[in-house]
Amino acid sequence: VANAIKLLGKSMRYVLENNGTTFTALKNELNHIETYIMIQKMRFGDKFDYELCVDDDIDTEQCRILPLLLQPIVENALVHGLEEKEEGGMITLQVERCGGSEDIRITISDNGCGMDEATLAQLRRDIEEKNPEKKESIGLYNINQRIKLCYGEQYGMAVQSELEKGTAVSITISMKTQQFV
């Protein structure tokens, strides 16, 4: 219980410190995800594992990202992808440079239930177009809009999924213009 309270406090501190801020270090956002995962592991036990992979040429202290961007995606992976799995669930967070460019791609993937083609197509539409009747996809829509507003229209979110194999949500952002000065 004491550890859970400590982790919840750490998570709340991050949320409050970043309320109203434009950018935070990628390292801070990844630390927040690690805290969130530890809290969820208390809830789910050994039903899932987590792996973080960051390319060596990405300086997570210098690279800046919109705060609170990744947690809703990790939460979706747990709730929609892995919650029904009894064991062997896996969430992977991969941070990589896109080719030789100054862009980075952050991919959050799970080995959960995945989606059929029709569900995936609808989710992709919901991410791009606001649908007031669909409350479920509003978080992903908002994340995609935040990315486009802050980084430009060429950036954003992409979703891949295969039924019974899992889902991957990728965010592409610019690393070049978001360096600490």
Please state what every model-predicted region is.
Residues 1-160, 168, 172:
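Two-component histidine phosphotransfer core
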Residues 174-178:
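Two-component histidine kinase transmitter core
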